[in-house]
């Protein structure tokens, strides 16, 4: 499994409640560009419309070797391929106040298909973010002290 892009801010800004694996509909030059790692997930989010899941605001840079007439919108909405029950479950979460669905990472699976890891998340407050940072620093300090004693 080769990771093409990760949304590093997602785990910092959100508390991930549940994750899903979704296929994504891309054009040929988008696939080539994505496999080169030209993907940005930072501001992306998922919406459910008419029983279909769509990924908004994900930036895929135009493929370098594609001619000018074939270049499309780099931030267009892209359809996610999920089972109907998964879409309904995500829709149930999205109707609750304070919950959202965001992409966590994009990767190539063992069969060569590009997949997107979707997380249903709740936004963290500034206090929660500080607490997480503090816990991480304490854990790092304990590991550092443990290494010195050996």
UniProtKB/Swiss-Prot annotation:
GO cellular component, one term: cytosol
Gene3D superfamilies tied to this protein: 2.40.280.10
Main location: cytoplasm
GO terms assigned for molecular function: RNA binding
Compartment(s): Cytoplasm
Gene Ontology process terms (BP): trans-translation
Transmembrane helix in keyword set: no
HAMAP family: SmpB (MF_00023)
Family listed: Belongs to the SmpB family.
Function: Required for rescue of stalled ribosomes mediated by trans-translation. Binds to transfer-messenger RNA (tmRNA), required for stable association of tmRNA with ribosomes. tmRNA and SmpB together mimic tRNA shape, replacing the anticodon stem-loop with SmpB. tmRNA is encoded by the ssrA gene; the 2 termini fold to resemble tRNA(Ala) and it encodes a 'tag peptide', a short internal open reading frame. During trans-translation Ala-aminoacylated tmRNA acts like a tRNA, entering the A-site of stalled ribosomes, displacing the stalled mRNA.
The name this protein goes by in its record: SsrA-binding protein
Originating species: Coprothermobacter proteolyticus (strain ATCC 35245 / DSM 5265 / OCM 4 / BT)
């Amino acid at each position: 499994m080769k990771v093409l892009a990760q949304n590093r801010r997602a785990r910092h800004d959100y508390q991930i409640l549940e994750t899903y694996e979704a296929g994504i509909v891309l054009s040929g030059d988008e696939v080539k560009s994505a496999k080169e790692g030209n993907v940005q997930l930072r501001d992306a989010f998922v919406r459910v419309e008419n029983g279909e899941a769509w990924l908004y605001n994900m930036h895929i840079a135009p493929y370098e070797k594609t001619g000018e007439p074939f270049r499309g919108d780099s931030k267009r909405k892209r359809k996610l391929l999920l089972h109907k029950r998964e879409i309904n479950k995500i829709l149930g979460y999205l109707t609750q106040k304070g919950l959202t669905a965001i992409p966590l990472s994009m990767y190539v699976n063992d069969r060569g298909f590009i997949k997107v890891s979707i997380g249903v998340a709740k936004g963290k407050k500034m206090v929660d973010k500080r607490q997480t940072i503090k816990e991480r620093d304490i854990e790092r300090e304990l590991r550092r002290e443990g290494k010195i004693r050996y």
